[in-house]
Amino acid sequence: MHINFSYPYIIPSSHINLSLTLISLEEWALITFNGKDAVKYLQDQLACDVTSLKNNEYTFTVHCNTKGKVYSNVYFLHYQDGFALITRKSVYANELNIFKKYAIFYTVNINFHQNKILLGIAGLQVKDILSNIFTTIPNRLCPVIHTMDTTILYLHQPADRFLLITTNNIQNLILKKLTKYKIQTNNSKQWLALDIAAGYPIIDQINSELLLPQALNIEALGGISFNKGCYLGQEAIARTKYHNMNKKELCFLSGKANRIPTASEKLEIKINNNWRYTGIVLAACKLKNNIWIQVVLNRNLAIDSILRVRGDITSVFHLCPLNYL
């Protein structure tokens, strides 16, 4: 399967009214690690505690530079005879080079897998229907399973959905078995919309090495260990926590505008009768009736704050709650 495989794009839907949908994750990439030093190496690289991660678990975490700024956020899990992380396609090449740079003193193999298929499945009755394809599926108590040449991750935000690391043959089997259901396909913009609503950060290359993990809510998502010892960026990340230095947080906005803001641009916020630049956009997605934005803003903004896209005086956006905050 070609690295750029994707299903045709259709306008994404909210999780509230999403029909059963099989989603190609062409904007994500899979990097694997194995070898006798893989645990020690990854413990020195990532912000999570690699040693405490169980085989049937995954975690959100970050890979940072020495200043604690995030190269990228990742899904991290046990995979085959080692570990895997799923990261954004736009950053994987740079991340791969950095991982290999720091690996010269370790016995560890690091590989990018373009022959694996990354799929998402979400929407109406997704649990029941996936259970008709696989003999067992993951849940909140066991969020990762490995079966039929496939690894399946369960995500419960913003609604039940699953991420699959699989093969072309299994993908074809899934499509064949789903023909009797009213299933639609979509590309990764649908998964992006779900991640925005869930509050799972999206770091593409343009925003790489700009933000501390706390500003991305990674601590709230359980992706930072403060007990594991040294790793890249650890001093800055710990100092930010213990000196209460973080003044930013990841937010979810919903509203309307004449254009979709791009990653790295600023928004405007209304303060009294004036508009001021604020925040940094991480991702945005057009839905059928509105636009969703993921943005890093100052912490503790009033819930009734009004924001808009720069240069679009008719646009209006409001904060939406994130369930883990």
UniProtKB/Swiss-Prot annotation:
GO BP terms: iron-sulfur cluster assembly; RNA modification; tRNA processing
One matching Pfam family: YgfZ_barrel
Statement: the UniProt record of this protein carries the keyword Cytoplasm: yes
GO molecular function terms noted in the UniProt entry: folic acid binding
Major subcellular location class: cytoplasm
Residues that hold folate according to the record: 28, 191
Task performed by this protein: Folate-binding protein involved in regulating the level of ATP-DnaA and in the modification of some tRNAs. It is probably a key factor in regulatory networks that act via tRNA modification, such as initiation of chromosomal replication.
Protein family: Belongs to the tRNA-modifying YgfZ family.
Protein name according to UniProt: tRNA-modifying protein YgfZ
